[in-house]
Every structure is written in C-alpha cells, then in structure tokens.
C-alpha cells in the first residue's frame, strides 16, 4: 500500500499533510503494541497540529507501556477523492496503518461543524459508521472534547463518550481496553466496563 500512497501524494495539494515523519512522533512498531489508539482530529492537519490538547494526549498515551497512539486527520477534498478512486483506506500519519486496523479510534470534538467529518473519517477508514453495525473485529470508537458534553447528535455513531477532562481518564480508558484485549473479552463486555468509568 505504501507505493500506492506515494503515487496519490503526487496528485494532491499540500501532500505534507499526509506524510508524518515529524520529530518526536511515536516510534514503537505497530505490530509490537499491546493496544493501538488512532487519535482522530476531524479537521485538516494544519488545524490539528495547532491544537495543544492533541499534543498533550498524544504524549500521555505514548508514555503508557504497551500503548501506541498515532494521529489521523481529516483529508482535504482532493485527498478524499484520491483515496476513494484508488480504494485506499484513510490511514495514520506515523505508520500509514488503515483506521480500521486500530483497536481504539478516538475523536476529539472541538466544535459541532466537525461532526460530518467524523462520519467521513470513519467511512474512509473502513470502520462501520453506525455503532450498531460494528462487530468483534472493529475498533471501539470513543469521543471526547468540549462537544462531548452533549452526546446526543452523535450517539448512533460513537461507542462511548468521554465527558470531562481527557487528561484525567484517557490513560485509564486505554489501559482498561488493553486489559480487556488480553482477557479476550467481547465487545459488549468491553463497552460495559467502559460505562463504569467516571468522566
């Protein structure tokens, strides 16, 4: 898939948005992680990288033993079209892993106008858009941030909402899901345990 991605980068405006490789990014191999977390910002790379909260949570998660957090940003229209034309799923910046292969897909909801981008990112990444359509092999989709205080508009698409300060509980959530994977718990059991965590 790497060669196909390189080819489409030649066709899009601002290909640096999708290249990654910045200093201080996560370096643990994807296959060696006990649990993988796709940190999704439903806006372009430029907006995402100007957001301090994303950098803080990225650092917190990658400091947890066995956890790998990678970033995924909303592609611009030209890249969306190229991904669809070439049948390439939306991928992470660090390892270019398709969104659907992560254990956890986490969205930060900073403003309501980004809600449609959440749905676009799920669809582009090969993750069933509706929570009810997800099976045992699909990621657990969570969302936090200021707009998570009103989960109703996205409740049909998100498995669990983090209401409150993400810095306080994101480590607990990720470690819980890591342990659930070790115990081979079902999706329903995992979500049941998540529901018991206080926001």
Model-derived regions: residue spans:
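Low-complexity, highly charged intrinsically disordered N-terminal segments
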Residues: 37, 41-42, 48-59, 66-83, ...
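Short boundary motifs at domain starts and secondary-structure transition points
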Residues: 22-32, 95-97, 191-192
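Helix-enriched interaction subdomains in cytosolic or periplasmic regions
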Residues: 1-15, 64
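Flexible, glycine-rich loop/tail regions that form catalytic "lids" or insertion modules at the edges
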Residues: 20, 27-29, 38-41, 103
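Glycine-rich beta-alpha loop elements in corrinoid/cobalamin-binding modules
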Residues: 74-199
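ER/secretory pathway lumenal C-terminal domains and tails of membrane proteins involved
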Residues: 3, 21-26, 59
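Residue-level signal for beta-strand positions within conserved beta-sheet cores that form or flank
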Residues: 33, 65, 137
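General detector of N-terminal leader/presequence modules that precede the first folded domain
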Residues: 35-37, 43, 48-52, 56-64, ...
């Amino acid at each position: 898939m790497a060669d196909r991605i390189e080819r489409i980068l030649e066709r899009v405006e601002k290909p640096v948005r999708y290249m990654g490789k910045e200093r201080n990014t996560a370096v643990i191999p994807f296959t060696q992680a006990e649990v993988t977390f796709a940190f999704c910002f439903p806006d372009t790379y430029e907006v995402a990288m100007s957001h301090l909260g994303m950098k803080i949570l990225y650092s917190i998660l990658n400091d947890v033993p066995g956890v790998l957090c990678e970033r995924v940003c909303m592609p611009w229209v030209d890249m969306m079209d190229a991904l669809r034309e070439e049948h390439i799923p939306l991928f992470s910046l660090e390892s270019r892993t398709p969104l659907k292969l992560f254990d956890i897909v986490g969205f930060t909801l900073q403003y309501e106008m980004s809600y449609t981008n959440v749905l676009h990112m799920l669809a582009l990444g090969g993750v069933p858009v509706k929570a009810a359509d997800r099976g045992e092999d699909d990621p657990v989709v969570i969302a936090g941030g200021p707009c998570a205080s009103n989960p109703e508009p996205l409740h049909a698409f998100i498995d669990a909402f983090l209401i409150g300060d993400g810095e306080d509980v994101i480590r607990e959530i990720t470690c819980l899901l890591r342990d659930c994977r070790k115990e081979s718990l079902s999706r329903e059991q995992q979500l049941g345990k998540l529901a018991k965590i206080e926001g």
